[in-house]
Amino acid sequence: MRLLERVLSFAGAGVLFVGLASQAQMIDNTQAPNTAKAGINKSLLDEIGAGRGDVMTPGSSIFIINRDPFRAIRRGRQLFQRKFTRLQGQGANEKDGVGDINNDIAIGAGLSDSCALCHGRPRGSGGAGGNVVTRPDSRDAGHLFGLGLKEMLADEITTDLRATRDLAIAKAQQTKHPVTMKLVSKGVNYGSITANPDGSLDTSKVAGVDTDLRVKPFFAEGSTISIREFVVGALHNEMGMEASADPDLLAASTGGRVVTPSGMVLDGSKDKISPPPAPDDQNGNEVDPAIVDHLEFYLLNYFKPAHYIQNSSTDRGRAVFNKTGCSSCHIPDMTINHDRRVADVETVYDPVNGVFNSLFATASTLYYTKDDGSGNPVLKLPLGNSFVVRDIFTDFKRHDLGANFYERNWDGTMQTMFLTRPLWGVGTTGPYGHDGRSITLNDVILRHGGEAQAARDAFAALKSNDLNNLLAFLNSLVLFPPDDTASTLDPADPSKLNFPQFGHGSIKLTVLFNDPTDLE
Protein backbone atom coordinates (compact mmCIF):
# COMPACT_ATOMS: atom_id res chain seq x y z
CA MET A 1 0.00 0.00 0.00
CA ARG A 2 1.19 3.55 -0.39
CA LEU A 3 2.24 5.89 2.34
CA LEU A 4 0.36 9.13 1.86
CA GLU A 5 2.92 11.63 3.06
CA ARG A 6 6.57 12.03 3.79
CA VAL A 7 8.43 9.11 5.29
CA LEU A 8 11.66 8.99 7.18
CA SER A 9 14.19 6.23 7.35
CA PHE A 10 14.88 5.12 10.89
CA ALA A 11 18.64 4.98 11.24
CA GLY A 12 19.97 1.50 11.82
CA ALA A 13 16.56 -0.13 11.72
CA GLY A 14 16.46 -0.88 8.03
CA VAL A 15 12.82 0.12 7.82
CA LEU A 16 10.70 3.01 6.63
CA PHE A 17 8.32 4.68 9.04
CA VAL A 18 6.61 8.01 8.98
CA GLY A 19 8.07 10.84 10.93
CA LEU A 20 4.63 12.18 11.84
CA ALA A 21 3.53 9.08 13.51
CA SER A 22 1.20 7.58 15.58
CA GLN A 23 -2.07 7.36 17.32
CA ALA A 24 -2.74 4.47 19.63
CA GLN A 25 -6.05 2.81 20.15
CA MET A 26 -6.54 5.04 23.16
CA ILE A 27 -4.12 7.73 21.83
CA ASP A 28 -0.36 8.14 21.66
CA ASN A 29 0.80 10.51 24.38
CA THR A 30 3.72 11.70 22.28
CA GLN A 31 1.30 12.95 19.62
CA ALA A 32 -1.73 13.85 21.73
CA PRO A 33 -0.64 14.70 25.28
CA ASN A 34 -3.46 14.62 27.79
CA THR A 35 -3.87 15.57 31.42
CA ALA A 36 -5.02 12.07 32.37
CA LYS A 37 -1.82 10.63 30.90
CA ALA A 38 -3.88 7.83 29.37
CA GLY A 39 -2.64 5.82 26.41
CA ILE A 40 0.72 4.76 25.00
CA ASN A 41 3.65 6.72 26.40
CA LYS A 42 6.20 6.07 23.66
CA SER A 43 6.16 6.92 19.98
CA LEU A 44 6.40 4.14 17.44
CA LEU A 45 10.01 5.06 16.72
CA ASP A 46 10.78 4.86 20.44
CA GLU A 47 9.19 1.41 20.53
CA ILE A 48 11.39 0.31 17.62
CA GLY A 49 14.36 1.73 19.51
CA ALA A 50 17.69 0.47 18.18
CA GLY A 51 16.00 -2.14 16.02
CA ARG A 52 16.62 -5.84 16.63
CA GLY A 53 20.24 -5.51 17.73
CA ASP A 54 21.65 -7.98 20.23
CA VAL A 55 22.18 -8.41 23.98
CA MET A 56 24.95 -5.79 23.86
CA THR A 57 22.95 -3.10 22.01
CA PRO A 58 20.96 -0.94 24.47
CA GLY A 59 17.49 -0.08 23.26
CA SER A 60 17.27 -3.01 20.85
CA SER A 61 14.55 -5.63 21.10
CA ILE A 62 17.02 -8.44 21.85
CA PHE A 63 18.63 -6.36 24.60
CA ILE A 64 15.28 -5.52 26.22
CA ILE A 65 13.85 -9.05 25.96
CA ASN A 66 16.93 -10.50 27.66
CA ARG A 67 17.71 -7.77 30.20
CA ASP A 68 14.37 -6.04 30.86
CA PRO A 69 11.84 -8.70 29.84
CA PHE A 70 8.79 -7.25 31.56
CA ARG A 71 9.27 -4.01 29.66
CA ALA A 72 9.40 -6.09 26.48
CA ILE A 73 6.10 -7.75 27.40
CA ARG A 74 4.45 -4.41 28.11
CA ARG A 75 5.86 -2.90 24.92
CA GLY A 76 4.46 -5.81 22.97
CA ARG A 77 1.07 -5.18 24.53
CA GLN A 78 1.21 -1.50 23.63
CA LEU A 79 2.08 -2.42 20.05
CA PHE A 80 -0.81 -4.89 20.08
CA GLN A 81 -3.19 -2.10 21.09
CA ARG A 82 -1.61 0.56 18.89
CA LYS A 83 -3.83 2.04 16.22
CA PHE A 84 -1.49 2.04 13.24
CA THR A 85 -1.98 4.79 10.69
CA ARG A 86 -1.83 4.86 6.93
CA LEU A 87 1.29 6.97 7.25
CA GLN A 88 2.91 4.05 9.03
CA GLY A 89 2.01 1.58 6.29
CA GLN A 90 -1.43 0.40 7.38
CA GLY A 91 -3.92 0.05 4.57
CA ALA A 92 -5.01 -2.04 1.65
CA ASN A 93 -2.48 -4.19 -0.13
CA GLU A 94 -2.02 -3.51 -3.81
CA LYS A 95 -4.67 -6.10 -4.70
CA ASP A 96 -7.24 -4.29 -2.55
CA GLY A 97 -9.82 -7.08 -2.71
CA VAL A 98 -9.24 -7.93 -6.38
CA GLY A 99 -7.76 -11.20 -7.58
CA ASP A 100 -7.88 -14.99 -7.42
CA ILE A 101 -9.34 -15.56 -3.97
CA ASN A 102 -9.51 -19.31 -4.65
CA ASN A 103 -5.73 -19.41 -4.27
CA ASP A 104 -5.10 -16.33 -2.14
CA ILE A 105 -7.60 -16.17 0.70
CA ALA A 106 -5.86 -13.12 2.14
CA ILE A 107 -7.67 -11.02 -0.47
CA GLY A 108 -10.75 -11.26 1.74
CA ALA A 109 -8.93 -10.40 4.95
CA GLY A 110 -8.89 -7.14 6.92
CA LEU A 111 -8.54 -4.37 6.86
CA SER A 112 -7.79 -3.59 10.48
CA ASP A 113 -5.69 -0.85 11.99
CA SER A 114 -4.95 -2.59 15.29
CA CYS A 115 -4.45 -6.13 16.56
CA ALA A 116 -7.01 -5.31 19.24
CA LEU A 117 -9.68 -4.60 16.64
CA CYS A 118 -10.14 -8.33 15.95
CA HIS A 119 -8.94 -9.54 19.36
CA GLY A 120 -10.65 -6.87 21.38
CA ARG A 121 -13.02 -8.17 24.03
CA PRO A 122 -12.79 -7.40 26.87
CA ARG A 123 -11.32 -3.92 26.31
CA GLY A 124 -8.52 -4.58 23.88
CA SER A 125 -7.26 -7.48 25.97
CA GLY A 126 -6.25 -9.90 23.23
CA GLY A 127 -9.64 -11.53 23.53
CA ALA A 128 -12.18 -12.61 20.94
CA GLY A 129 -14.62 -10.55 18.98
CA GLY A 130 -13.76 -9.97 15.33
CA ASN A 131 -15.17 -11.61 12.22
CA VAL A 132 -12.85 -11.83 9.23
CA VAL A 133 -13.91 -12.91 5.75
CA THR A 134 -11.09 -15.34 5.07
CA ARG A 135 -13.77 -17.96 4.28
CA PRO A 136 -17.15 -17.56 2.54
CA ASP A 137 -18.95 -17.96 5.87
CA SER A 138 -16.38 -15.87 7.80
CA ARG A 139 -14.20 -16.73 10.76
CA ASP A 140 -14.68 -15.51 14.32
CA ALA A 141 -11.32 -14.43 15.72
CA GLY A 142 -10.40 -16.48 18.77
CA HIS A 143 -8.87 -15.04 21.93
CA LEU A 144 -5.12 -15.03 22.46
CA PHE A 145 -4.92 -15.62 26.21
CA GLY A 146 -2.38 -18.34 27.00
CA LEU A 147 -1.09 -18.32 23.42
CA GLY A 148 2.48 -19.08 24.47
CA LEU A 149 1.35 -22.07 26.50
CA LYS A 150 -0.41 -23.42 23.42
CA GLU A 151 2.70 -22.93 21.28
CA MET A 152 4.94 -24.70 23.79
CA LEU A 153 2.58 -27.64 24.32
CA ALA A 154 2.09 -28.18 20.59
CA ASP A 155 5.83 -27.99 19.94
CA GLU A 156 6.62 -30.51 22.68
CA ILE A 157 3.93 -32.89 21.44
CA THR A 158 5.47 -32.65 17.97
CA THR A 159 8.90 -33.51 19.40
CA ASP A 160 7.47 -36.54 21.22
CA LEU A 161 5.60 -37.86 18.18
CA ARG A 162 8.60 -37.47 15.91
CA ALA A 163 10.85 -39.19 18.45
CA THR A 164 8.46 -42.15 18.41
CA ARG A 165 8.53 -42.18 14.61
CA ASP A 166 12.33 -42.12 14.54
CA LEU A 167 12.49 -44.91 17.12
CA ALA A 168 10.14 -47.03 15.02
CA ILE A 169 12.35 -46.52 11.96
CA ALA A 170 15.47 -47.49 13.92
CA LYS A 171 13.82 -50.64 15.28
CA ALA A 172 12.51 -51.65 11.86
CA GLN A 173 15.95 -51.27 10.32
CA GLN A 174 17.52 -53.21 13.17
CA THR A 175 15.04 -56.11 13.14
CA LYS A 176 14.47 -56.15 9.37
CA HIS A 177 10.72 -56.26 10.05
CA PRO A 178 7.96 -53.61 10.06
CA VAL A 179 7.47 -51.98 13.45
CA THR A 180 4.22 -50.33 14.56
CA MET A 181 4.22 -47.93 17.49
CA LYS A 182 1.49 -45.93 19.18
CA LEU A 183 1.77 -42.17 18.90
CA VAL A 184 1.09 -40.84 22.38
CA SER A 185 2.14 -37.56 23.97
CA LYS A 186 0.94 -35.83 27.13
CA GLY A 187 -1.74 -38.47 27.53
CA VAL A 188 -3.23 -37.92 24.06
CA ASN A 189 -3.42 -40.72 21.47
CA TYR A 190 -2.57 -39.64 17.92
CA GLY A 191 -3.02 -43.08 16.41
CA SER A 192 -0.09 -45.21 15.34
CA ILE A 193 2.67 -45.30 12.77
CA THR A 194 4.37 -48.22 11.03
CA ALA A 195 7.99 -48.09 9.93
CA ASN A 196 9.41 -50.45 7.32
CA PRO A 197 13.00 -51.73 7.17
CA ASP A 198 13.70 -49.57 4.12
CA GLY A 199 12.82 -46.44 6.12
CA SER A 200 9.44 -45.87 4.50
CA LEU A 201 6.40 -45.16 6.68
CA ASP A 202 2.76 -46.19 6.74
CA THR A 203 0.94 -43.18 8.19
CA SER A 204 -2.59 -44.34 7.40
CA LYS A 205 -3.36 -44.80 11.11
CA VAL A 206 -2.09 -41.38 12.21
CA ALA A 207 -5.02 -39.52 13.79
CA GLY A 208 -5.72 -35.84 14.34
CA VAL A 209 -2.42 -34.49 13.03
CA ASP A 210 -0.62 -34.20 9.69
CA THR A 211 1.45 -37.17 8.58
CA ASP A 212 4.65 -35.20 9.26
CA LEU A 213 3.48 -35.25 12.91
CA ARG A 214 3.74 -31.48 13.28
CA VAL A 215 1.02 -30.14 15.60
CA LYS A 216 -0.12 -26.72 14.40
CA PRO A 217 -1.96 -25.01 17.25
CA PHE A 218 -3.11 -21.82 15.54
CA PHE A 219 -6.22 -21.10 13.47
CA ALA A 220 -9.39 -23.17 13.57
CA GLU A 221 -8.15 -25.78 11.11
CA GLY A 222 -4.65 -25.96 12.61
CA SER A 223 -2.48 -24.39 9.93
CA THR A 224 0.28 -22.40 11.63
CA ILE A 225 3.18 -23.55 13.79
CA SER A 226 4.39 -20.48 15.61
CA ILE A 227 3.40 -17.17 17.16
CA ARG A 228 5.93 -15.42 14.95
CA GLU A 229 4.31 -16.66 11.74
CA PHE A 230 0.92 -15.73 13.18
CA VAL A 231 2.07 -12.17 13.95
CA VAL A 232 3.76 -11.52 10.61
CA GLY A 233 0.79 -12.99 8.73
CA ALA A 234 -1.74 -10.90 10.64
CA LEU A 235 0.23 -7.69 10.15
CA HIS A 236 0.20 -8.34 6.41
CA ASN A 237 -3.19 -9.93 5.81
CA GLU A 238 -5.31 -7.97 8.27
CA MET A 239 -3.45 -4.66 8.47
CA GLY A 240 -1.63 -4.44 5.16
CA MET A 241 1.79 -4.01 6.78
CA GLU A 242 4.77 -5.97 5.49
CA ALA A 243 7.45 -7.41 7.79
CA SER A 244 9.27 -8.59 4.69
CA ALA A 245 12.73 -8.31 6.24
CA ASP A 246 12.00 -10.58 9.20
CA PRO A 247 15.28 -12.49 9.49
CA ASP A 248 13.85 -15.51 11.30
CA LEU A 249 11.11 -16.31 8.81
CA LEU A 250 13.40 -15.53 5.88
CA ALA A 251 15.95 -18.07 7.11
CA ALA A 252 13.55 -20.78 8.26
CA SER A 253 11.31 -20.61 5.20
CA THR A 254 14.32 -21.35 3.00
CA GLY A 255 15.44 -24.40 4.96
CA GLY A 256 17.42 -22.85 7.79
CA ARG A 257 17.17 -23.41 11.52
CA VAL A 258 16.67 -20.41 13.80
CA VAL A 259 15.75 -19.74 17.40
CA THR A 260 13.47 -16.72 17.68
CA PRO A 261 13.97 -14.14 20.46
CA SER A 262 11.17 -15.92 22.34
CA GLY A 263 12.98 -19.25 22.17
CA MET A 264 10.86 -20.97 19.52
CA VAL A 265 12.89 -23.21 17.21
CA LEU A 266 11.90 -22.89 13.56
CA ASP A 267 13.58 -25.53 11.42
CA GLY A 268 12.88 -25.29 7.72
CA SER A 269 14.53 -28.66 7.10
CA LYS A 270 11.76 -30.33 9.13
CA ASP A 271 8.74 -28.06 8.70
CA LYS A 272 7.22 -25.79 6.10
CA ILE A 273 7.65 -22.33 7.59
CA SER A 274 5.60 -19.47 6.16
CA PRO A 275 7.87 -16.90 4.51
CA PRO A 276 7.41 -13.22 5.26
CA PRO A 277 5.41 -11.31 2.66
CA ALA A 278 7.12 -9.68 -0.27
CA PRO A 279 8.12 -6.05 0.24
CA ASP A 280 5.52 -3.45 -0.53
CA ASP A 281 5.78 -2.35 -4.16
CA GLN A 282 6.35 1.28 -3.24
CA ASN A 283 7.68 1.30 0.30
CA GLY A 284 9.57 -1.95 0.73
CA ASN A 285 9.76 -3.37 4.25
CA GLU A 286 7.34 -1.51 6.52
CA VAL A 287 7.64 -3.34 9.84
CA ASP A 288 10.94 -3.46 11.68
CA PRO A 289 11.81 -6.91 13.09
CA ALA A 290 11.93 -5.31 16.55
CA ILE A 291 8.16 -4.82 16.40
CA VAL A 292 7.66 -8.50 15.63
CA ASP A 293 10.09 -9.46 18.41
CA HIS A 294 8.13 -7.54 21.05
CA LEU A 295 4.76 -8.80 19.81
CA GLU A 296 5.99 -12.40 19.81
CA PHE A 297 7.45 -12.09 23.32
CA TYR A 298 4.27 -10.47 24.62
CA LEU A 299 2.08 -13.25 23.24
CA LEU A 300 4.46 -15.95 24.51
CA ASN A 301 4.06 -14.58 28.03
CA TYR A 302 0.45 -13.49 27.77
CA PHE A 303 -1.71 -14.45 30.72
CA LYS A 304 -3.93 -17.49 30.73
CA PRO A 305 -7.70 -17.07 31.29
CA ALA A 306 -9.24 -16.75 34.74
CA HIS A 307 -11.56 -18.77 36.94
CA TYR A 308 -14.63 -16.89 38.12
CA ILE A 309 -16.88 -18.08 40.97
CA GLN A 310 -16.10 -21.68 41.91
CA ASN A 311 -18.72 -23.32 44.12
CA SER A 312 -20.66 -26.55 44.55
CA SER A 313 -22.57 -25.90 41.33
CA THR A 314 -19.41 -25.50 39.22
CA ASP A 315 -17.86 -28.52 40.95
CA ARG A 316 -20.87 -30.62 40.00
CA GLY A 317 -20.75 -29.13 36.51
CA ARG A 318 -17.14 -30.23 36.09
CA ALA A 319 -18.17 -33.76 37.06
CA VAL A 320 -21.01 -33.67 34.50
CA PHE A 321 -18.52 -32.41 31.89
CA ASN A 322 -16.42 -35.52 32.49
CA LYS A 323 -19.40 -37.88 32.67
CA THR A 324 -20.85 -36.79 29.31
CA GLY A 325 -17.55 -37.50 27.56
CA CYS A 326 -16.67 -33.88 26.79
CA SER A 327 -13.28 -34.30 28.48
CA SER A 328 -12.25 -37.07 26.09
CA CYS A 329 -11.30 -34.33 23.60
CA HIS A 330 -11.39 -31.26 25.85
CA ILE A 331 -8.63 -32.58 28.12
CA PRO A 332 -8.27 -30.28 31.14
CA ASP A 333 -4.59 -30.40 32.09
CA MET A 334 -1.25 -30.84 30.32
CA THR A 335 2.34 -30.37 31.45
CA ILE A 336 4.99 -28.32 29.67
CA ASN A 337 8.46 -29.80 30.13
CA HIS A 338 10.43 -26.62 29.36
CA ASP A 339 8.61 -23.35 30.04
CA ARG A 340 10.06 -20.44 28.03
CA ARG A 341 8.07 -17.73 29.82
CA VAL A 342 9.49 -15.35 32.41
CA ALA A 343 6.32 -15.10 34.52
CA ASP A 344 2.97 -16.69 35.21
CA VAL A 345 -0.24 -15.02 36.36
CA GLU A 346 -3.02 -16.91 38.15
CA THR A 347 -6.32 -15.01 38.11
CA VAL A 348 -9.24 -16.11 40.28
CA TYR A 349 -12.51 -14.89 41.73
CA ASP A 350 -11.75 -12.74 44.78
CA PRO A 351 -14.35 -10.03 45.50
CA VAL A 352 -12.38 -8.78 48.52
CA ASN A 353 -9.15 -7.95 46.69
CA GLY A 354 -10.69 -7.63 43.23
CA VAL A 355 -12.87 -4.70 44.18
CA PHE A 356 -13.51 -3.58 40.60
CA ASN A 357 -14.35 -6.79 38.72
CA SER A 358 -14.16 -9.41 41.51
CA LEU A 359 -11.00 -10.91 40.02
CA PHE A 360 -7.52 -10.85 41.54
CA ALA A 361 -4.27 -11.98 39.93
CA THR A 362 -1.19 -13.44 41.60
CA ALA A 363 1.99 -12.99 39.57
CA SER A 364 4.97 -15.33 39.87
CA THR A 365 8.31 -14.72 38.19
CA LEU A 366 9.92 -17.60 36.30
CA TYR A 367 13.41 -16.28 35.54
CA TYR A 368 16.93 -16.30 36.93
CA THR A 369 19.56 -13.56 36.70
CA LYS A 370 23.02 -13.80 35.20
CA ASP A 371 25.70 -11.13 35.26
CA ASP A 372 27.64 -11.42 32.02
CA GLY A 373 30.24 -8.87 33.16
CA SER A 374 29.38 -6.46 30.35
CA GLY A 375 28.37 -3.60 32.62
CA ASN A 376 24.84 -3.79 31.25
CA PRO A 377 21.85 -4.76 33.39
CA VAL A 378 21.95 -8.43 34.32
CA LEU A 379 20.39 -10.98 32.01
CA LYS A 380 16.96 -12.21 33.13
CA LEU A 381 16.46 -15.58 31.51
CA PRO A 382 13.64 -18.16 31.69
CA LEU A 383 14.12 -20.88 34.30
CA GLY A 384 12.92 -23.46 31.80
CA ASN A 385 11.20 -25.59 34.42
CA SER A 386 8.16 -27.77 33.91
CA PHE A 387 4.74 -26.17 34.29
CA VAL A 388 1.30 -27.74 34.65
CA VAL A 389 -1.22 -25.98 32.41
CA ARG A 390 -4.56 -26.43 34.13
CA ASP A 391 -8.01 -26.19 32.59
CA ILE A 392 -6.93 -25.57 29.00
CA PHE A 393 -9.41 -28.22 27.76
CA THR A 394 -7.97 -29.35 24.43
CA ASP A 395 -6.17 -32.33 22.91
CA PHE A 396 -4.43 -30.45 20.07
CA LYS A 397 -6.01 -32.83 17.56
CA ARG A 398 -8.16 -32.22 14.52
CA HIS A 399 -11.60 -33.83 14.55
CA ASP A 400 -14.58 -34.21 12.24
CA LEU A 401 -17.50 -32.77 14.21
CA GLY A 402 -20.08 -33.39 11.53
CA ALA A 403 -21.76 -31.33 8.84
CA ASN A 404 -22.97 -28.63 11.24
CA PHE A 405 -19.36 -27.48 11.62
CA TYR A 406 -18.22 -27.88 8.03
CA GLU A 407 -17.29 -24.67 6.26
CA ARG A 408 -16.99 -23.70 2.64
CA ASN A 409 -13.68 -22.71 1.12
CA TRP A 410 -13.48 -20.18 -1.70
CA ASP A 411 -12.40 -22.86 -4.17
CA GLY A 412 -15.59 -24.86 -3.56
CA THR A 413 -14.06 -27.50 -1.30
CA MET A 414 -15.25 -28.13 2.24
CA GLN A 415 -13.20 -27.83 5.41
CA THR A 416 -14.27 -30.79 7.56
CA MET A 417 -11.53 -31.11 10.18
CA PHE A 418 -10.97 -28.64 13.00
CA LEU A 419 -8.74 -28.42 16.04
CA THR A 420 -10.30 -28.97 19.42
CA ARG A 421 -10.74 -25.41 20.60
CA PRO A 422 -9.44 -24.86 24.16
CA LEU A 423 -12.33 -24.06 26.46
CA TRP A 424 -10.51 -21.76 28.85
CA GLY A 425 -12.19 -18.36 28.62
CA VAL A 426 -15.27 -19.87 26.97
CA GLY A 427 -17.63 -18.14 29.40
CA THR A 428 -16.83 -14.76 27.84
CA THR A 429 -16.18 -15.57 24.18
CA GLY A 430 -19.61 -15.90 22.61
CA PRO A 431 -20.85 -16.20 19.94
CA TYR A 432 -19.39 -19.67 19.51
CA GLY A 433 -17.93 -21.93 16.86
CA HIS A 434 -15.05 -21.11 14.55
CA ASP A 435 -17.54 -19.13 12.46
CA GLY A 436 -19.44 -17.46 15.30
CA ARG A 437 -22.73 -18.99 14.16
CA SER A 438 -23.80 -20.36 17.55
CA ILE A 439 -25.25 -17.78 19.91
CA THR A 440 -25.09 -19.70 23.21
CA LEU A 441 -23.04 -22.46 24.78
CA ASN A 442 -26.11 -24.69 24.65
CA ASP A 443 -26.40 -24.06 20.90
CA VAL A 444 -22.78 -24.82 20.07
CA ILE A 445 -22.73 -28.03 22.13
CA LEU A 446 -25.90 -29.31 20.44
CA ARG A 447 -24.30 -28.42 17.10
CA HIS A 448 -21.66 -31.12 17.64
CA GLY A 449 -21.85 -34.35 15.67
CA GLY A 450 -19.43 -36.68 13.94
CA GLU A 451 -16.74 -37.82 16.36
CA ALA A 452 -18.51 -35.92 19.16
CA GLN A 453 -21.99 -37.34 18.52
CA ALA A 454 -22.04 -39.51 21.64
CA ALA A 455 -20.99 -36.65 23.91
CA ARG A 456 -23.51 -34.37 22.23
CA ASP A 457 -26.32 -36.87 22.79
CA ALA A 458 -25.31 -37.31 26.43
CA PHE A 459 -25.47 -33.54 26.84
CA ALA A 460 -28.89 -33.37 25.17
CA ALA A 461 -30.20 -35.98 27.61
CA LEU A 462 -29.12 -34.13 30.76
CA LYS A 463 -31.70 -33.29 33.37
CA SER A 464 -32.13 -29.60 34.11
CA ASN A 465 -30.03 -29.57 37.29
CA ASP A 466 -27.08 -31.27 35.60
CA LEU A 467 -27.45 -29.02 32.56
CA ASN A 468 -27.46 -25.86 34.68
CA ASN A 469 -24.44 -27.02 36.67
CA LEU A 470 -22.50 -27.83 33.50
CA LEU A 471 -23.26 -24.43 31.99
CA ALA A 472 -22.34 -22.73 35.28
CA PHE A 473 -18.99 -24.52 35.15
CA LEU A 474 -18.31 -23.46 31.56
CA ASN A 475 -19.39 -19.89 32.26
CA SER A 476 -16.88 -19.72 35.12
CA LEU A 477 -14.01 -19.97 32.61
CA VAL A 478 -13.52 -16.30 31.75
CA LEU A 479 -11.28 -13.72 30.12
CA PHE A 480 -10.46 -10.40 31.78
CA PRO A 481 -8.94 -6.97 31.02
CA PRO A 482 -5.44 -7.01 32.58
CA ASP A 483 -5.25 -3.24 32.97
CA ASP A 484 -8.46 -3.29 35.03
CA THR A 485 -7.74 -6.38 37.16
CA ALA A 486 -6.07 -5.93 40.54
CA SER A 487 -3.00 -8.03 41.25
CA THR A 488 -0.12 -8.61 43.62
CA LEU A 489 1.84 -6.24 41.37
CA ASP A 490 -0.69 -3.41 41.63
CA PRO A 491 -3.36 -4.04 44.28
CA ALA A 492 -6.54 -2.02 44.45
CA ASP A 493 -6.59 1.08 46.64
CA PRO A 494 -10.16 2.27 47.27
CA SER A 495 -8.82 5.31 49.14
CA LYS A 496 -7.57 6.85 45.90
CA LEU A 497 -9.31 9.99 44.71
CA ASN A 498 -11.93 9.23 42.04
CA PHE A 499 -11.85 5.50 42.77
CA PRO A 500 -12.46 3.22 40.87
CA GLN A 501 -11.27 5.17 37.82
CA PHE A 502 -8.06 5.44 39.82
CA GLY A 503 -6.81 2.81 42.20
CA HIS A 504 -8.70 -0.19 40.83
CA GLY A 505 -5.44 -2.09 40.38
CA SER A 506 -3.91 -3.74 37.33
CA ILE A 507 -1.48 -6.35 35.98
CA LYS A 508 0.64 -3.85 34.06
CA LEU A 509 4.03 -5.38 35.03
CA THR A 510 5.49 -1.85 35.37
CA VAL A 511 6.87 -2.52 38.86
CA LEU A 512 9.03 -5.28 37.35
CA PHE A 513 10.75 -2.95 34.85
CA ASN A 514 14.41 -2.19 35.47
CA ASP A 515 13.25 1.44 35.68
CA PRO A 516 9.58 1.55 36.70
CA THR A 517 9.52 5.33 36.28
CA ASP A 518 10.10 4.99 32.51
CA LEU A 519 6.56 4.17 31.41
CA GLU A 520 5.61 2.39 28.22
Write out the residue ranges for each language-model feature.
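Bacterial N-terminal signal peptides that target proteins for export
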Residues: 1-11
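Periplasmic c-type cytochrome electron-transfer domains
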Residues: 3, 22-520
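Bacterial N-terminal signal peptides
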Residues: 9-19
